Amino acid sequence: MLLRFRTANVRSLRDEQELTFVVPEDDPGTSARLVRLAGDQSLAVLPLIGIFGANASGKSNVLAAMTDMRAAVINSYARWAAFDGTARIPFALNDKDGQQSASFFEVDLVLDGVRWTYGFELGTDRVEAEWLHSYPRGHRQVWLDRDASRAKVYDWPGNRVKDRAGLERRTRPNALLLSTAGTDNHPQLTPLFHWFRRNLWLINPEDEREQREAFTTRELTGSRARRINELLRVADLGITGAEVVQEGTGPATVKLTHRSAAGDVAFDWTQESFGTRSWFALLGPLLLALDEGAVLLVDELDASLHPRFAAEVVRLFHDPQANPQGAQLVFTSHDPSVLGTPSGGRLLEPGQVWLTEKDEEGATDLYPLTAASPGEGEDLMKSYLAGAFGAVPSLLEGQIARRLLAANERERECEAERSGS
């Protein structure tokens, strides 16, 4: 289970930003779950966070930074060998000194009842630092302390890690040691490596949608078929079921059956709407995350789903019976309707709502709604749209039309000047 994510100098996130799922135990709200830790300790942890903000404010970059960290752990040992340096994306608007600064990533997570902190810093050419701490009885144990600026790059306090010399020897300067250990199936570090493989999956409206459609299609022949069909039917799309069609040696395709006056009719996949295909493509990864207790990242949850669909996805992660493994969801959205219910209640608690804004230098600031101290009965959607919490476009009514008319007028004036010369 993910507790916190921190990052700096990554994409539009110039300064250090933190996204936290942990809430005070004395005020956990109705959504937080109590996570038991070794040493008779516990933490109240949220199953879901929504990130809201104006266009180009950096919402998507928060999720992208999380997947950048995942990719570095999974790929740096096996795939970065062909690079002269590291595959990082620093803040692009930095001055020259800022461009050379390291990119920082860190997570706190719970694995088998033990809290772990793992992080690293990537420079242009090499891994500048890497660290791993555990808290088996509430007290920190340092497993790894890597610092490329020292004469002795690796330090192993307590000598807890096996095959230390081998790990040092096999880890290139531009690769993470955890990536080396996981790829080589190290007995102690592989579980943490596998956490990154099984978590922080990113879904956005377009990228890899065909792969997700193919994945859900394969799931229709497995143990999740009944639930996929049920979620297709309950979505009120007129769908009565799905069938997998295998023609020759090509990849399997899916046909969704629809109600008609003459009975069920199977539609070719190309005839399905964008919204239907988006819902179908989401179901495979969604059910896998719920079954595995994984962290799922969904960019622009509202982009291709009706607000009621988006609300039902949120409710799935909130419901302990539907989500018994403690899966977590981080999503971005432009649509504030997901903040509340039609009856005026709150679908998300203030602690689950995070906002993004860009400053004058193009850097994203990520902050929780709780920083604005909303009232206990305050309508979060109305207050957000009114700009009470920030993170909304700074547009006046009719401003776009006025700017367009002014630009058209200037264009006509320039054309007249060219014609007269």
List each language-model region with its residue ranges.
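Switch/communication elements of ASCE P-loop NTPase nucleotide-binding domains
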Residues: 1-41, 47-70, 260-383, 391-392
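Extended helical coiled-coil dimerization/tether regions that scaffold
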Residues: 8, 207-271, 399, 404-421
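Short, surface-exposed secondary-structure junctions/capping segments
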Residues: 29-41, 150-176, 283-287, 380-400
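Conserved P-loop NTP-binding catalytic core
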Residues: 36, 42-50, 54, 63-124
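An exposure/low-complexity boundary signal
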Residues: 62-101, 171-230, 319-328, 334-337, ...
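P-loop NTPase motor core
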Residues: 91-153, 157, 356, 366-384
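Electropositive, glycine-dotted interaction segments
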Residues: 115-244
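Acidic, Mg2+-coordinating catalytic modules of nucleic-acid enzymes
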Residues: 369-421
